Amino acid sequence: MILYPAIDLKDGQCVRLLHGDMEKATVFNNSPADQAERFVRDGFSWLHVVDLNGAIEGKSVNTAAVQSILESISIPVQLGGGIRTLEGVEAWIEAGVSRVILGTVAVHDPDLVRKAARLWPEQIAVAVDVRDGKVAVDGWTGLSDLDAITLGKRFEDVGVAALIVTDISRDGALTGVNVEGVGELADAVSIPVIASGGVASVADIERLKARPGVEIAGAILGRSLYAGTIRPAEALTIAAA
């Protein structure tokens, strides 16, 4: 299992939100590049970056902060938030992003996601952000009428690298990961599934690894790392076991 430390960008700073609420942002580092370097020193092999302003505005906003991260580290970066055109995908891949995450556009224009996956095989992930059983859009400010499995099945066999499933009700709350919800999606699709939202302790990582059925490909760690409820070395050892 791959563990992805998260850097969420708001107004150029590294923050964590509670339940995706932009008004409930805690700043953890004024330098995203410095935070990225810390995660590399901790031993992580991937980095998960989200442009929060971009997710709301529908276009990349924290461009300078993302570029500073890309210039400061050598591990692969997956980036989401406001990327809704093929030109946007191409620009970030050319800038050095290893995997682009598409969320809102996956709901509204699935053909664009399929085309992106064909153009950049294994470099496109789909964000499946769930609130009250339905997939959220527009920086989690709106709800679609799709459930996670219906959305995930849209992208079978087109070269999508991963589905990143987030339980919004648990995001940033340190309340524990929704193993059942993540597992249901993983069992229903052939695309690797990455768990996000509420991963609070190494016990959550152990629960994801121990569940029967399809293996969970990864987990995103956010507030748990910043708050110190997960120690990187211990988590990485468990994930690699």
From Swiss-Prot:
Record GO biological process: L-histidine biosynthetic process; L-tryptophan biosynthetic process
Per the annotation, which location comes first and is thus the protein's main one? cytoplasm
Q: What class of enzyme is it?
A: isomerase
- Please name the catalytic residues of this protein: 8, 129
Localisation: Cytoplasm
Q: Does the record carry Disulfide bond as a key word? A: no
Which GO molecular function entries does the Swiss-Prot or TrEMBL record give?
1-(5-phosphoribosyl)-5-[(5-phosphoribosylamino)methylideneamino]imidazole-4-carboxamide isomerase activity
What chemistry does it catalyse, as a reaction equation? 1-(5-phospho-beta-D-ribosyl)-5-[(5-phospho-beta-D-ribosylamino)methylideneamino]imidazole-4-carboxamide = 5-[(5-phospho-1-deoxy-D-ribulos-1-ylimino)methylamino]-1-(5-phospho-beta-D-ribosyl)imidazole-4-carboxamide
Q: Which cysteines are joined by disulfide bonds?
A: none
Q: Does the UniProt entry include the keyword Cytoplasm?
A: yes
Pathway, per UniProt?
A: Amino-acid biosynthesis; L-histidine biosynthesis; L-histidine from 5-phospho-alpha-D-ribose 1-diphosphate: step 4/9
Report one GO cellular component.
Answer: cytoplasm
Q: What is its EC number?
A: 5.3.1.16
**What family does the Swiss-Prot or TrEMBL record give for this protein?**
Belongs to the HisA/HisF family.
HAMAP family documented for this protein: HisA (MF_01014)
- Mind telling me what this protein is named? 1-(5-phosphoribosyl)-5-[(5-phosphoribosylamino)methylideneamino] imidazole-4-carboxamide isomerase
